[in-house]
Structure formats: structure tokens, C-alpha cells
Amino acid sequence: MGHHGQMHAQHGVTMPADSPTGQPDRSEQRYFPATAFRTRRSTLSDAQRQTWDRRWPELGLSVGPAEDPDRPGPPLDTDAWFGRKAPVVLEIGCGNGTSTLAMAKQEPGVDVIAVEVYRRGLAQLLCAIDRDNVTNIRLIRGNALDVLQRLIAPASLTGVRVFFPDPWPKARHHKRRFLQPGTVGLIADRLLPGGVLHVATDHAGYAEHIADVGAGEPRLRPADPDSPLPISVARPTTKYETKAQDAGSAVTEFIWLRR
């Protein structure tokens, strides 16, 4: 399988159930416009809600469906948002942010934008950012395809991370998987030359699908294990993977570079 991408099998698995990045058909996509956010406020603790109200205006951005998806607005000014010029990594489906936080701390010179649809996961990450005084993470609540299409400029990202996207295991749902040729092509378009696409999955069938999709994208090539990379790919093992290790689940990782 090595010709499809750099793949590492290791024991472990899974992310919380509330962190899918698999996307339904366009007509079925779950958007969270600003008017809908209040309906889930009760899911946050008082401390989380207070931190959200205090820090979200500075560190967060909510993205709803475009009125005209064929006419995207201006892309994010990441230099202004972070207050500096630095390499930018987009993490799609950050869940509760365990990996996001650890990897951002590991590389303080890299700016990380974490995308997630679920407010509770973002609130957990926001509280950790506030507690640990982490300055190189920003958060987006919304649909990952909307973010890629409307907010990210071509050839602007040093890395994209997609860890444990929803595998949609039933055959009739495979079309809902996030990592399809069109999406991977869009990611490739947003990566700088030499930029990294780092994917991890614990689902064997999805791993085969991802390998095929990556091999079919001409702008990506497998990373050479001996070549230096512009960002770290040392992904921390979460408690969810540790718990599943006893079950014999294996994680497959892919690392591609933009040509």
C-alpha cells in the first residue's frame, strides 16, 4: 500500500462520537447558522459558557451556508487573525481538540485553525486554550467544505489534518465520506507547494478508499519517510485510541505532499 501514500499502521483508534467530518450530500448538510446556536447552549457547563462568551469573539468564527456558493467572499486574513505571519495548518474535524492542543503546543511557530460543527467540542478546546494560554489556535464552527471553498485562499496552507473522519461504513453511505476525489482536489488546491496532507483513520475499508483517492490526485505525492517536512506529523495518542488498543484496532496514517 506504500505507493498510495506514506501509511503507518499502529494500534489504537477512535475519536469521540460527536466529531464526524463525513459530509452528507449538499442537500442534507448540517449547517449551524448563528440563529441556531442558542438551541445547543444547554449542552455547555456554566464554566464553558462563560469562557465561550469571553473568548469566542476573539478566537472563533461561525460559518453558515453561503447565499451564493458559486461566489465566495474574500478569504480569511490569517495574518490579521493571528497577529503575525506564520505557517498555517487547517485541522478538519477537531472533536474536543485533544490532538489540536497538543500539536499546537509542540509547534508554537505554526498557526492552527481547527474546524468542527459541534459546539461542545469547540468549547472544550476553547477552555483548554484559555487555561493554558495557548496563542496559536483559532476556531471555526461550520461545514469543512464551506470553509475550504469560501475562507481559504488557494496555495495558502502549509498543512491540512483530517484525523478520524466519519467512515460511513454502510455501502449506501459511502458517497457521504468526506475524503472524496473532489474534496481532496480542493485540499490540494489550498496547499502551498510542499504542503502536507495528513490523514488518519481507524476504519480499514475507509483506509483503502483514502489510499485510492490520494493516488488519484496528481497534485499530491507520498511523503518520503526520510525527507524533512514543513510541519510535525507527530500525532498524539488520545485516550480514545488507548481504550481501543485492547480491542486490536489499528490506525492507518497517510502523509502526502503537494507537488
UniProtKB/Swiss-Prot annotation:
UniProt catalytic activity: guanosine(46) in tRNA + S-adenosyl-L-methionine = N(7)-methylguanosine(46) in tRNA + S-adenosyl-L-homocysteine
Entry keyword set: Methyltransferase, S-adenosyl-L-methionine, Transferase, tRNA processing
S-adenosyl-L-methionine as UniProt keyword: yes
Region annotated Disordered, chain positions: 1-74
Pathway: tRNA modification; N(7)-methylguanine-tRNA biosynthesis
InterPro entries: SAM-dependent_MTases_sf, tRNA_(Gua-N-7)_MeTrfase_Trmb, tRNA_methyltr_TrmB_bact
Gene Ontology cellular-component terms listed: tRNA methyltransferase complex
Signal peptide interval: none
List of catalytic residues: 166
Known function: Catalyzes the formation of N(7)-methylguanine at position 46 (m7G46) in tRNA.
Protein's recorded name: tRNA (guanine-N(7)-)-methyltransferase
